[in-house]
Amino acid sequence: MTRKNIFIVGFSGSGKTTVGAEVANLLQWKFIDIDQQIVNKTSKSIAEIFKLNKGEQYFREIEKATLKELIHFENQIISTGGGIILDEGNLRSMLDNGYVICLDADPNTILTRLNLQSLSSDNIVRPLLDSDDQLEKIIKLKNERDPIYKKSDYIIKTDGLTPREISNQIIDHWVKIYS
């Protein structure tokens, strides 16, 4: 079976959006960021959604519905939220309808990237990382999620690599598998 999409999963700050956009550009495929789709759909930031009464549960429901809408199309690079894999049905849908690539990084690398992102003009707020000890929170969440991330088709350690290097690895691997 040829899988028709590439899904990029991984912890917050692993580079999913940046790398996904780069891979889509290189392959001339459509790039979709699920978090951005949710923001567009709800007219609320991810942080605002998390602050609603239903909080994370409500966000995960919207995330699942958005994924279900997207899997019916082809030639897409889909960047997911870091926690999408917490729902086993989401992971199964991605594995059945595409090739799942996990971007992995050490907790210190993730913290550095998230701090750099928070300094950008976007001022991205990561609700699940709202903590006095962010490194400890990253380690805890990563330890919980890593066994699920390991079910991906391919895992790339991104520490010390540029988005272009990671993108080239993804494309090289994709070509080997599907040529």
How should each PLM-predicted stretch be described?
Residues 34-83, 88-95, 120:
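ATP-dependent small-molecule kinase phosphotransfer cores
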Residues 1-3, 22, 26, 143-179:
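NTP-dependent small-molecule kinase module
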Residues 25-36:
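Post-Walker A helix-loop "phosphate-sensing" segment adjacent to the P-loop in P-loop NTPases
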